[in-house]
Amino acid sequence: MSDLFRTILLFGAPGSGKGTQGKILGQIPGFFHLSCGDVFRALQPESDLGRMVLEYSSRGQLVPDDLTVKLWQVHASRLVDAGHFSPDGEILVLDGIPRNVAQAELMQSYIDVKQLVYLETHDQEKMVARLNRRALHENRLDDTNEAVIRRRFAEYERETAP
């Protein structure tokens, strides 16, 4: 058996529903959902890495590719070691990573992509409203500032959009 994680990738703009769809898939036996945002939020905010990630996200900027992939890889390995994710019996559902070609290249030695799902949205104002609601309900600080949200859309268009 391959050491690569069998993976489904969820792509889409901020607020397109990647996390929602990932959570739904993750509840189905045989699937495990892992959001890159959850990896970042799992960092201790007072740690050097936590402060660094918060600094980028509070400005609506992407965390550098090599750091993002390394943090993801360490987090995924911990999930396997703790028995939360079983690569032999579960398909990994990823959202928020990889965001660009550089991250995809860095992740080639970890994942075997079986399916790619692109969630297309056309109304940016509805996505802003969705992100603002999420900020209130899920205490997501990265979704509280509309200027930051709009910078995230611009980053998505520049770095990720097909």
Map each language-model feature to its residues.
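Pre-Walker A (Motif I) flank of P-loop NTPase domains
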Residues: D3-I8, D88-E90
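Hydrophobic/aromatic beta-strand patches that form the interior of the parallel beta-sheet core
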Residues: I8, L34, Q115-V117
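P-loop (Walker A) phosphate-binding loop of NTP-binding proteins
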Residues: A13
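Conserved lysine of the Walker
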Residues: K18
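ATP-dependent small-molecule kinase phosphotransfer cores
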Residues: F32-S109
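A glycine- and Lys/Arg-enriched "phosphate-lid" helix/loop adjacent to the NTP-binding pocket
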Residues: F40, E55-S57, S109-T160
